[in-house]
Amino acid sequence: MTKIDLLVKNAHVFNVYLRKFEDVNITIKDGKFYWINKELPGIEAAKVIDLQGKYVIPGFVDAHMHIDSSMTTPKVMGQTIGKYGTTTIIADDHEITNVAGVKGLKDFIDEKAPIDIFFGIPSSVPSTNPNMETTGGLIGVKETEELLKDPRFVCLGEVMNFKDMTSDHDTLIKKIIAACRKARPTMPLEGHVPAYHSEDLAKVIYAGITTDHTQQTSSLVDEKIRSGMFVEIQLKSMHQEVIDTVIEHGYFEHVALVTDDSMPDTLLKGHLNLLVKKAIDMGMRPEDAIYISTYTPARHMGLWDRGAIAPGRVADFIVLNNLEDLSIAQVYKNGLPFAAKDEKDNNVYPEELLHSVKAPKLSEADFDLKTDLVQNGKVVANIIQINEVGTFTNHIQKCLEVKDGHVQWKKAGLALMLCQERYGKNEGRYAFALIDRGIVGDGAIGATWAHDHHNLIILGTNIAGMVSVQNLLVEEQGGYIAAKGSQIVANAPLPLGGVVSLEPMSVLGKQISKVRETMVDLGYKNTNEIMSFSTLSLLVSPTLKISDKGIFEVKTQRHIPLFEC
């Protein structure tokens, strides 16, 4: 007689190896699946659960996400997404690393969480180079080799610097890739490969990159898979043509659903389960949608012990009421019911992480946009134009009036953006940009959660409001703030590194939701307003972006002047 801890009977159980449901019984012993079969002779169970025909699938595995990009901690993230069935994540926490380096990263990830968390080694800190952006942390070969010794790190986090990756020179990122290949020859090397195709794509794969998660089209998915890449499909890539391409070509072995950046207010509704449900709604068989959110991501990351309901695998599973709406009845972690909590993070973090915003406060005079190209007349402005979908921008030009050296940007229907160095390295130096299709109403938004350098960014049409937002960001040591007119109406403090909240998700989600509502009221138009604004500073996301060192064209990394004659 074999004694086991739990017997789960009368269930439709998903077999990932056959990609179909079977009417079998499940046994669990010491937190792992033991024997799965119709008949289980000689088994003595301490506890028996009769599911009465419900469906059982493996716990979801999210192979590409960022805990700190959800502005939260590992503990709160685990509390939040565990109840949605996500039991394993691979997190590339390069936000906190850009702020505080390897030490800050270790302080951040050492906290215990109620789900299993593996990590990617942040490869792009900074995302470009110190000549283009100022960061608090730097990751080089030495730091990479240090993290390679830690078994929690199972992949190289997304490599972003296309120019250095494909350069003829022996660049830093090439050295980092070589260090990974030497220490862990089969470790996945995650990429950030937006819109690259043909020879550019070949160059990236030739450099060693195995995976891409960025915004996809059907043709890009097809080309990447045919070229040997594993493609991670996030929400913004879930267009009908992309899903149809995966289905029609049977690309299920080569793709996974991932969340990448989940906003706190979105996490109040769900996590990876929402993408699985969406894939089903778009015509994918439930069995295939489940497969690419459990088994393929686990296999891709070398996590053989999960992503399947089979002997020896970690007993993480989800009980579903039905397959039509993916309604979750119960989640189990290590064979035990997942206990959903919504608690504040009371972990004690180092003081340097709690006091990372060292920028001086600004006044209205600091926001006076001037040019020395002409005293009275016109200048040509290089303008960042926001798109309503995605994080890519357009580079446009407009002629603007100049009076007594002051640029009359408001008359052109533009918004003013400022990016200020906040690590105490350059005395709070700042650069300006002009934004088209940003805020059109009277107000301002600002954040220290500014991908990926996380300097202080402000966008607005009301100078007094911009000053109010900037001053409060400094006082509160970071956050996401919005003002109408000169009055602050929404505030999400992010005191940990200026990028992470310590509040439970129920509180943080509502705070970010209020910021988002204010942005919409001010006329900001994008399918993800928060991410759109916070990636206006992301120097690896096309086309034109800003840092504390100015405006840059992403692909060429060329500095672009704000004004030309």
Swiss-Prot record:
<dbReference type="Pfam" id="PF13382">
    <property type="entry name" value="Adenine_deam_C"/>
</dbReference>
<dbReference type="InterPro" id="IPR006679">
    <property type="entry name" value="Adenine_deam"/>
</dbReference>
<keyword id="KW-0464">Manganese</keyword>
<dbReference type="InterPro" id="IPR026912">
    <property type="entry name" value="Adenine_deam_C"/>
</dbReference>
<dbReference type="GO" id="GO:0006146">
    <property type="term" value="P:adenine catabolic process"/>
</dbReference>
<comment type="similarity">
    <text>Belongs to the metallo-dependent hydrolases superfamily. Adenine deaminase family.</text>
</comment>
<dbReference type="GO" id="GO:0000034">
    <property type="term" value="F:adenine deaminase activity"/>
</dbReference>
<protein>
    <recommendedName>
        <fullName>Adenine deaminase</fullName>
        <ecNumber>3.5.4.2</ecNumber>
    </recommendedName>
</protein>
<dbReference type="InterPro" id="IPR006680">
    <property type="entry name" value="Amidohydro-rel"/>
</dbReference>
<dbReference type="InterPro" id="IPR011059">
    <property type="entry name" value="Metal-dep_hydrolase_composite"/>
</dbReference>
<dbReference type="Pfam" id="PF01979">
    <property type="entry name" value="Amidohydro_1"/>
</dbReference>
<dbReference type="InterPro" id="IPR032466">
    <property type="entry name" value="Metal_Hydrolase"/>
</dbReference>
<keyword id="KW-0378">Hydrolase</keyword>
